[in-house]
Amino acid sequence: MTTDDSTNSESRDPSAAHRAALPKLEKNMKRIQDLTQRLMGAMSNKRKVPQDLQGPAPELYSKAGTVAFQEMIQNPSKIIEQQIGYWGKTLQHFVDAQQAFGKGELAAPVDDTPTDRRFANPLWQSHPYFNFLKQQYMLNAQAMDKAVTEMEGLDDSEKRRLEFFSHQIVDMLSPTNFLATNPDALTKAVETEGDSLVRGLENMIADLEANDGELVVSLADKSAFTVGENLATTPGEVVFRNHMFELIQYAPSTEKVHTTPLIIFPPWINKFYILDLKAQNSLIKWIVDQGFTLFVVSWANADASSRDIGMTDYVEDGYLTAFETVREICAVKKVNAVGYCIAGTTLSLSLTVMKERGIDYVNSATLFTTLTDFSDRGEVGVFLNDDFVDGIEAEVKEAGFLDSYFMSKTFSYLRSNDLIYQPAIRSYMLGEAPPAFDLLYWNGDGTNLPGKMAIEYLRGLCQNDKFATTGFDVAGISAKIADVEVPICAIACESDHIAAWKSSYQGVQKMGSKDKTFILSGSGHIAGIVNPPTKKKYGYCTNDDLSVSPDGWQAGARQHEGSWWPMWGDWLAKKSGKKIDARTPGSASYPPLAPAPGSYVLRAKVV
């Protein structure tokens, strides 16, 4: 009875409910004061990021401004037409909103703006305030896009960069990225009486403290995963270790295996266990289950002592040493090899070095999302001009290595809405904990690059395209793409924003091999490769005619459902000889040193 009276009293006196909420509000305010002190401390320890690595050189914008001014003088009608079109749409929307409001309707006017998942909350469509903000933002974005796209007087590279970085500015200014104009965040704050904002501030400060004062949003719950426990769990042994890498040999899961072993070289920009996340999507486990003796390289993480490690070291002490070790362990003359991304590029360089030296270690090579022709560098090319590369060169000259922070930041901005803004909204505005997502956990587990190697790769390959043109100097030779003569199977991904598939295709075309297979998988740089048959996702296409242009190849390609793994497995089996009794990891000369996944994947360096 007392409870009912109290409830009725509060309903009759709204101020009673407000008074009841005051202790919680006061607690949150006190918590915010404490968090503010932590915030100031984190910001005061902010790392110094070179100006050259924070954005394109000012010359890009000044040239664009000059071009726009010249166009305005020389062709004023075009500018006037653009502005009148923009003004007309903006004013018409304002008039429609005013008319709806004048009729006493709390409803939004007609909304013909395109669908955008950032604006999924129904209030963006129905509420006049939020809909007005959304429509005005979309009109501004369209006007900016049109102005940049139709700008004349810039070369193709400059125009691509201007389009990319103008999109970054437009995306950053979306009303969804600000608390006062985000209905999801405002609703959550009211429903939780401010708790969501306090949790969001806690999340933000934790990210700042973990990243030397840089705001790098956590994409995954780091406490949910442990490498070697619930990631990278396929059984195996480390059978070799040097200053460059650990070599893992995986335990067989079949009684018989193919004679010719397989070795995978993952990119050293990230850690190898992207191929062994969980049993359900592990390419490593799948390969072992198909009856192959599998070795995988786990690269050492660079630090200041890696300053002078270059591409030649990767070829000599990495690839050639790994080939020799696997040949001896398995008592075979040849191996099959896989290179993923930059590791595929370096595998191709190693093949040319071996040809020059008369070494015949490799029976076939598979290239995952690999660039060997850098004439078109795709979306990532906006970060490969001298302004950025000069900044990287200065950074590695001082530090001796390229911190993983810079590579991670670069790749994140290629998908900023998915990898920066939406995660930040969930974490900082809604106060949600990062998801327990294995792929995103791996994405945040970056590695550093040796200083010398980073510059050789960026200057000689990415910028100057020497491997596909004049020759790239490595290991005492001038490596040329035409000297890659072993059988090749290349897998590229249609929406890859790091290794554009058309460039990958063009590189395969230039190789000297008479036995070439090209597979185009759906999706992107990671999901297109980590695409197990059980998921039945994405699909892939093939075309035996590699003499045509990329567009011609795609137009004539045959579409297949599901994963490309089984097709590649059949191709690889034909290159792998007869079946023999399964091999256990190691040999008399190379006894097991430690269980997989080894120690290099768990820390920066083994001393």
Question: Which ranges hold each PLM region?
Answer:
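Alpha/beta-hydrolase active-site loop
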Residues: S306-C330, T346
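Short alpha-helix in the alpha/beta-hydrolase fold that links the catalytic acid
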Residues: A500-K510
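Amphipathic, low-complexity, repeat-rich surface-exposed segments
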Residues: M1-E246, V257-H258, F295, G507, ...
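Short beta-strand element of the alpha/beta-hydrolase
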Residues: V257-W268
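Short amphipathic alpha-helix adjacent to the substrate-entry channel of hydrolases
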Residues: D276-L294
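Short beta-strand/loop motif that positions the catalytic acidic residue
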Residues: A490-A492, D496
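Alpha/beta-hydrolase-fold enzymes
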Residues: E152-K188, E328, V332, T346, ...
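Gly/Ala-rich beta-loop-alpha elbow adjacent to hydrolase catalytic centers
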Residues: G339-G344
